[in-house]
Amino acid sequence: MSSVAEENQKAKIEFIDAFFDDYDNKANYLRELYKTDRRDEARILCACYIDGLASALCWPDERSNYNYVAILRAHGGNEIFAYIHPKMLDDALNKLSEQRKWKKIFPTISDKLKVADRRLYEEHEILELLAPHLNAAELELVRKEFWRGTFAAIIYSRFRVSAVHGFGPPDGTTFDLTTFKGKSVPAIDFFMVHGCLKRIIGVTRDISKNSGKWFGHDFKRER
C-alpha cells in the first residue's frame, strides 16, 4: 500500500472511530433521557438506533424486520434472542397462511405449535416437533421462517414496531406463563434493549475498523 493510500486509510479509521464515538454518546444520553421521565423518547430512539445499525450491517438486504432480528441474535449478547416462542411462531406463520404454499401445511404446523409446552424452544427442538408431520421440502420451508418466532422477533414486534408506528412500547413486556431453561423469561424493557444497543455499537465499530470498511462492506457489492 502506498504512503498516500496508507494515510487515506488511517484517516478513514479515525473517521470511523469518531462516528461510533458519537453513536456511543447518543446511546449513553438515552439513559439520562429515560431518568428524566422522557421514557417514550428514550425507547423510540433506542429502537431506531438499533434499526439503523441493523440496516447498515445487513446491507443490501432491505428487510427491516429480518435485519433487526438478525443483529439481535448475532450481536445482542444474550442466547435467549435465538430461542423460539411457539405461540409467536404460530401467529407469525398464520400471517403467511393465505399464500398457496402455506395453505396445506399451516394447519398441521399450527396444531403442533399450539400444544407445545409454555417455554422457549431451541431451533432443533421445533424441528423435532414438526419433522414427523412434514416432508423434507416442507420442513425446510418452515425452518427458513423460524426467525419470525424468536425472542428477538418479539422484541422487534413489541418494542421497535410499537415505538415507531404506535404510541411507544410498554415499559416492560412480561411473560408470566412462559419459561426459559426452567426460569421466568426476562421482561423486555428499555434496559434490556439499551444493553443490546451498546453491544451492537461496539461490534459494528470493530467490524468496520478491522475490515477497514464501513460496516464491513463500504456499501459496495462484491464482484
Predicted regions and their residues:
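Surface-exposed polar/charged interaction patches
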Residues: 33-36, 74-78, 95, 99, ...
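Polyanionic, low-complexity intrinsically disordered segments
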Residues: 2-18, 39, 100-223
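Residues that form generic nucleotide/phosphate-binding pockets
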Residues: 22, 71-75, 203
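Short non-catalytic regulatory patches outside canonical folded cores
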Residues: 52-140
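Alpha-helical structural motif
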Residues: 26, 64-68, 155-156
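Short N-terminal edge-element motif at the start of the domain
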Residues: 13-34
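Short, hydrophobic, well-ordered secondary-structure elements
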Residues: 27, 31-61
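Generic structural signal for well-ordered, non-membrane alpha-helices
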Residues: 24-28, 48-51, 158-161, 165
